[in-house]
Structure formats: C-alpha cells, structure tokens
C-alpha cells in the first residue's frame, strides 16, 4: 500500500470524525436539554458516573465543548498536519485514534454499549490501524531515502 493511499484514508477518517464531532456539538448547543434528540435520559447517568463533576452536567453545554475540543479540534489539527506533510502527521493521526478510543471507553463505562458508541469504537480502531500503517510507511520511506543518500555520497568518494 502506498503512502499516498494511506494518507488519503487517514484524511478521510480525520474529516469524518471531526465532522461528526461538529455535528454532535451543534446538536447539543441547539438543544442543551437533550429533549429534541432524545438524549435527556443520559444526563442523570452522567451525573451519577461523575458525581464530582455533576455541576457540569445540568445540560449538554459542557459535553458539547468537550466533544468539539477532544475529537473535533484534535482531528482538525491532524488534518492540517497531514495536508502540510508535517513530520508529525502520522503520529497526530494515531493520537487522534487513541483519544477517540479512550472517549468511547468512557462512554461504555457510563452508558454501556450503544450502537453509535460501538460504531465510533470501530471507527477509532480503523483510524488507529491506518495511522500505524501510516507511521510504518513514513518510517520505511524515510529510511529508504536516507539509505539512498548515504549510498550516493559514499559512492562518490
């Protein structure tokens, strides 16, 4: 698999997850009570799971900003790094996948298994797997380039 294909797949996952976070943010800001999207039964479970943070879970405002920052902004930064071919692009993609997986584990702890959480858990696993391939391909292409340049400069002498 070529680096270009892996980079494109990683961009897909980054855009998809960042867009999902933006939509989730919009839903929670549009109706902080959660009634419109039938999320209101989740608030008592949040307060029960995190009693020391119960003051934050009177509505979904804090959850909305947490979702946007933790999954939206981090993936947006990763997308930027991938587009710029930054040396940390593959690592940022791996970290985004790990952060999403941690987020999903917290959701499993609070609410148990739900279809959306399981789906995003699978998306996180795909993002992590692709980022691992991305890292490996970047490393092998960097090693290959270094070996060619070493061969070229030592052959001239």
What residues fall within each predicted segment?
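Topology signature of small-to-medium multi-pass alpha-helical membrane proteins
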Residues: 1-157
């Amino acid at each position: 698999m070529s680096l270009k294909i892996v980079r494109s797949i990683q961009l897909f996952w980054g855009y998809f997850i960042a867009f999902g976070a933006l939509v989730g943010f919009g839903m929670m800001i549009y109706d902080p009570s959660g009634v419109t999207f039938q999320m209101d039964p989740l608030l008592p479970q949040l307060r029960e799971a995190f009693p020391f943070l119960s003051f934050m879970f009177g509505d979904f405002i804090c959850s909305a900003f947490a979702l946007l920052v933790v999954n939206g902004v981090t993936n947006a930064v990763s997308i930027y790094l991938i587009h710029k071919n930054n040396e940390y692009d593959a690592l940022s993609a791996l970290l985004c996948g790990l952060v999403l997986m941690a987020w999903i584990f917290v959701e499993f702890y609070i609410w148990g298994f739900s279809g959306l959480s399981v789906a995003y858990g699978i998306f996180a696993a795909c993002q992590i797997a692709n980022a691992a391939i991305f890292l490996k391909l970047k490393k092998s292409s960097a090693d290959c380039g270094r070996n060619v340049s070493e061969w070229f400069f030592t052959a001239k002498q």
